[in-house]
């Protein structure tokens, strides 16, 4: 006779009480704090000489133990079909440099399984980034779901591994890595299509682009002139002081456009700051 059962979600397989218990485990204030402090979820991790190799699990050790206990208790009484799996569809890392482009060094980033003593890259998904390549976005996609088990004294789960190479003479932070992911937990698992690790080089942000318009540059020059005139231009002649004040007023007050050919129009043209080489 063919199997006629239906696939049930984790919430359907467990009672409402145990489902609430799982929510408390995952989203309690303590769990959220542990995800930030132990896993650096959504936080910037600094790569320094004294931290040349960084291994960051995607689940805090305490949270891992509580989730594993939740699934095991449901499995032992026949409410759940397994002792639990961790699923991570994708891990996305934003990498930026914190030294000049001529610094000789690189980063090696990959996803590993803490159940592997060697911490080898999962399915060869590994990305190397030279310092002059940065900034960049890196992505990893595990091809399987990780069992929530303990191997030796290690809580098995996925982890982001970052290795710093080179950067001779740079003992401080040479790169910043911000990782984001969304871990899922279920009593069922699957295998997934193998996808190579993604590496997208990003153009550095041009923060001066908004000041390329003449109007923005003119405002910048006016503000600079206004800042230095009172401290540097100390004139003794009263008549010249009066003229200097009128120049300042021309720079600070935007008057309505005067008619072409009028004396006021020629006067404003005389005191207009000049733009040199697009600045």
Swiss-Prot record:
<dbReference type="GO" id="GO:0046740">
    <property type="term" value="P:transport of virus in host, cell to cell"/>
</dbReference>
<protein>
    <recommendedName>
        <fullName>Movement protein</fullName>
    </recommendedName>
</protein>
<dbReference type="Pfam" id="PF00803">
    <property type="entry name" value="3A"/>
</dbReference>
<keyword id="KW-1031">Host cell junction</keyword>
<comment type="similarity">
    <text>Belongs to the cucumovirus movement protein family.</text>
</comment>
<dbReference type="GO" id="GO:0044219">
    <property type="term" value="C:host cell plasmodesma"/>
</dbReference>
<dbReference type="InterPro" id="IPR000603">
    <property type="entry name" value="MPV"/>
</dbReference>
<keyword id="KW-0916">Viral movement protein</keyword>
<keyword id="KW-0813">Transport</keyword>
<feature type="compositionally biased region" description="Low complexity">
    <location>
        <begin position="254"/>
        <end position="268"/>
    </location>
</feature>
<feature type="region of interest" description="Disordered">
    <location>
        <begin position="246"/>
        <end position="279"/>
    </location>
</feature>
<comment type="function">
    <text>Transports viral genome to neighboring plant cells directly through plasmosdesmata, without any budding. The movement protein allows efficient cell to cell propagation, by bypassing the host cell wall barrier. Acts by forming a tubular structure at the host plasmodesmata, enlarging it enough to allow free passage of virion capsids.</text>
</comment>
């Amino acid at each position: 006779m063919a199997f006629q059962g239906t696939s049930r979600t984790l919430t359907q397989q467990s009672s409402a009480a145990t489902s609430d218990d799982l929510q408390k485990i995952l989203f309690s204030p303590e769990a959220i704090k542990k995800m930030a402090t132990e896993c650096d979820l959504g936080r910037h991790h600094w790569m320094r000489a004294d931290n040349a190799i960084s291994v960051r699990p995607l689940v805090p050790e305490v949270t891992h133990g509580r989730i594993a206990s939740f699934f095991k208790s449901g499995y032992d009484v026949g409410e759940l079909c397994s002792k639990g799996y961790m699923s991570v569809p994708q891990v996305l890392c934003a990498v930026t440099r914190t030294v000049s482009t001529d610094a000789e060094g690189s980063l090696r980033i990959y996803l590993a399984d803490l159940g592997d003593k060697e911490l080898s890259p999962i399915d060869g998904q590994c990305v190397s980034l030279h310092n002059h390549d940065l900034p960049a976005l890196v992505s990893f996609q595990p091809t399987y779901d990780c069992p929530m088990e303990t191997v030796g004294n290690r809580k098995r789960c996925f982890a982001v591994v970052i290795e710093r190479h080179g950067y001779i003479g740079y003992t401080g932070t040479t790169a910043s890595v911000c990782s984001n992911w969304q871990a899922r937990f279920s009593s069922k698992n699957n295998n997934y299509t193998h996808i190579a690790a993604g590496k997208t080089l990003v153009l550095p942000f041009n923060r001066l682009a908004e000041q390329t318009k003449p109007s923005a540059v003119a405002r910048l020059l006016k503000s600079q002139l206004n800042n230095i005139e009172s401290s540097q231009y100390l004139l003794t002649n009263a008549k010249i002081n009066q003229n200097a004040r009128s120049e300042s007023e021309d720079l600070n007050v935007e008057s309505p456009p005067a008619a072409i050919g009028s004396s006021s129009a020629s006067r404003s043209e005389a005191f207009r700051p000049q733009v040199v080489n697009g600045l």
